[in-house]
Amino acid sequence: LDFHAEATSEKGAMGWFLDGKVQAVWGTHTHVPTADCQILPRGTGFVTDLGMTGPSRSVLGIKPENSINLFMGGLPRRYEEAEGNCKLNACLFTIDTEKKRCTGVRRADIQE
């Protein structure tokens, strides 16, 4: 289950709420990968946030100067996608389809 939420506490609570009801819960939205891959007591694989896929030298995928301008009090302007090598943040969940439980979860991060 992909749970798109801002707060890590929301994602953690959802993981525990769904433990044993689904095979895996992963959070998305913050674009920052977390290092908390685990299997909850009733067999649900969980990670708070997968991270992002996109340009490595960026602020959430956009040119850093766009983000700096916004935070320094500049007028909002159209975001421009950063260029260059990309990264992939992910998790691999191993599922026992007969028992309907997660038996393994690990990060899979690739950076060019």
Model segments located where?
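Functionally constrained cores in energy, signaling, and assembly domains
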Residues: 2, 26, 91
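Short acidic, glycine-rich surface-loop motifs adjacent to enzyme active sites
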Residues: 1-9
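Conserved beta-sheet core of the metallophosphoesterase superfamily
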Residues: 8-81
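A short C-terminal boundary segment appended to hydrolase-like catalytic domains
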Residues: 67-112
